[in-house]
Amino acid sequence: HQEARRQRQMCIRDRSGAIVANGSLRQVKAAFDYGYNMGLAFQIIDDIMDYSSSKTKMGKNQGDDFKLGKTTLPIILAWEKSNKLEREFFLKSLQELKQEKGDFEKCCEILKKYSILNRCKKIANDFVIKAINALNEFSENDYKKALIELANNSLSRDN
């Protein structure tokens, strides 16, 4: 999947930077951990945006993941909370791709009913905290501050 590839690229890039800078093994691992956790947070925010952002903000159509039948974190968490009828709806809409007009809106209603997007934001925030904590292996400098700022800003991005 493209999401997994993006996450691996972030990990490799961040780990490579520590290696090139002659970082200790702990710093190389910390750089990997930063990239890994940022990749997860970034993907979760992207998943949230599919159900909450407009095309002008996001650069892609709202509901594209739903229309393609992608099982993203919001769908997984909604499935866990859903009753029998809601699960049947998800199976029809996402697994069988038998979607009707209004199904995306129905999905959004289910997500809202169970506060799924808020739960996803909390999970993304937890990954951002892990990413920032990984930077404790590095001394205070402008680069570290920029990485922390990037991590914090990733939670409020809208594209």
Q: Where do the protein language model's features map onto the residues?
A:
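Acidic/histidine metal-binding catalytic segments
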Residues: 25-28, 84-90, 139-150
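Divalent-cation-assisted or electrostatically stabilized phosphate/pyrophosphate-binding catalytic cores
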Residues: 5-6, 29-33, 55-81, 87-126
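Short hairpin/turn module used for nucleic-acid contact or packing/dimerization
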Residues: 117-159
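Alpha-helical transmembrane segments of multipass membrane proteins
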Residues: 15-20, 134
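Short helix-capping/linker segments at secondary-structure and domain boundaries
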Residues: 18-25, 80-88, 158-159
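Active-site alpha-helical segments that house and flank conserved acidic catalytic motifs
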Residues: 18, 28-56, 71, 75, ...
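Amphipathic, well-ordered alpha-helical segments in soluble domains
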Residues: 10-13, 44, 100-103, 127-130
